[in-house]
Amino acid sequence: IPNYDDNYVYDSLTLVFPFNASTKILAGDTATLQTYRVYRLKNFPPTDFDDPSIYNNETLPLYAPEKPLATLSVKLEKQFFTQNNNERYFKLDDDLGRELFSLIRRQDSILDPNNALDFMRYFAGLTIVPDKDNMALLPIDGSGLSLRCHYHLDVNTGTYTFRPLAAYASGGYYAFTNIEHSPSVRFSNVSWNNPLPYSNENKAVIQGQNGYMLKMKLPFKSDVNPYRTILKVEIVLEPKIDNFEDIPEPTTIQVFTLDKYSRISGKLTDLSGNSVFGYLETNPNYKEDRKYRIDITDYYNSMVSNGTGGIDPELNLLIGLAGSPV
């Protein structure tokens, strides 16, 4: 690590994110430029842990909203993510880079892992904001982000990597998703107190990353064996229980079918035309022993027993709250 007794020279500061194109799914328009900007947080995101809310409409506290630390415009094509050992990066503002490099050179105590809270107070974090005109989703794992300071001394180069910012927190609450949108006319007046029933509009609004909808690709069993009969097919989901939570799960969840473009094509039904639901099963003696059970036998048999020739028909379902304006 360089110090004030050395003549190391600052080069750059980068925010690096790993991306393995073979395991990630890019959704949307990957043929046009998509723009992403990085900002520094001025304070922690406002959060009331005593009265947590599903949505927090507080303004995100940024150091300089009019001046991003970095701007990256890219086409989200596979070759973009297969270079440099499946890593891509934002080159951040040099003023911030020199500020952090100064901490490194004087070996400031806030860089000691034992003083993690001091560093969090000094450097609240970074946020990546997609442009409002973006038409694609870029899945970035916040736990894999790394902040790197690059420097050199003569012909020798060096890199100082800060701990992942989420690692400074004692829980995953520090990694968060900020969603901003302008609702269409149809949904402009919808709120928790003024919902729009699913049955009225026959529409479901999906918000990924918030736990409302789960897309599931079902395993495929070929129908090439005419002597095999599928008697029962069920999906069993076990809610993850946190000790500090006391929020009751809904008693039912609903299942939707998707087309090959991942668009909702309708509600899943059985052979009698009845909607298929998942029902919450609880154990009064063991609070943590609870699960949703969804019977999809009719659907599965209809998909794999009609002469697919052993070709996987891509069985995708969407599971979410039953008829709620999410």
Per-segment meaning from a language model:
Residues I1-V326:
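Secreted, disulfide-rich extracellular signaling modules
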